[in-house]
């Protein structure tokens, strides 16, 4: 900050810069205990049903998070989950259990996925983390932008299934969303 001020002063033709404000003294926050919580999956808004994956913008949502949910066929062996593409950060859950994360910044698109029974619930929670407004990435849609696939090995050959029939939960980061959450001890 100070170096930038010094550099700018060369071009101010004698004008004086505003004074640097005094530093704000840090405060001490006393320790405290959390007494309640509001689990996200217990506080979801009404779902939108959709055959195909769509971005946040296609659901008229510009920020926050979005949860994609579907049920799976029986997977007798582990498979490979591919999310094309999660913008920006996705957490993957199978029947409520955390499986892993996909981070766009690291180019992550795939996770090893465990075997599961028919009807197991797949949840993909995608968080939008700001907008890119320049260069190649200016088309910066949020959520899942293309598809979700499971690839399983059958008799030595890969078989890929494009998952369909989604329940979609728009989780806008607003006071109205949070004020209606049901808290529990």
Q: Could you describe each region identified by the protein language model?
A:
Residues 1-183:
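Carbohydrate-binding surfaces of carbohydrate-active enzymes
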């Amino acid at each position: 900050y100070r170096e930038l001020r010094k550099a700018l002063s060369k071009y101010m033709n004698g004008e004086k810069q505003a004074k640097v404000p005094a530093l704000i003294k840090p405060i001490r926050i006393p320790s405290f205990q959390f007494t309640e919580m509001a689990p996200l999956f217990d506080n979801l808004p009404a779902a939108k049903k959709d055959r195909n994956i769509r971005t946040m913008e296609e659901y008229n949502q510009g920020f926050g998070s979005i949860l994609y949910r579907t049920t799976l066929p029986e997977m007798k062996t582990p498979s490979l989950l591919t999310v094309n593409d999660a913008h920006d950060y996705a957490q993957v859950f199978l029947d409520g259990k955390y499986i892993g994360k996909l981070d766009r910044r690291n180019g992550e698109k795939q996770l090893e996925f465990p075997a599961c029974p028919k009807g197991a619930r797949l949840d993909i929670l995608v968080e939008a983390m700001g907008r890119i407004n320049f260069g190649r990435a200016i088309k910066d849609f949020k959520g899942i932008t293309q598809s979700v696939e499971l690839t399983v090995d059958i008799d030595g050959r890969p078989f890929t299934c494009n998952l369909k029939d989604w329940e979609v939960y728009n989780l806008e980061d607003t006071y109205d969303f949070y004020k209606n959450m049901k808290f529990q001890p």
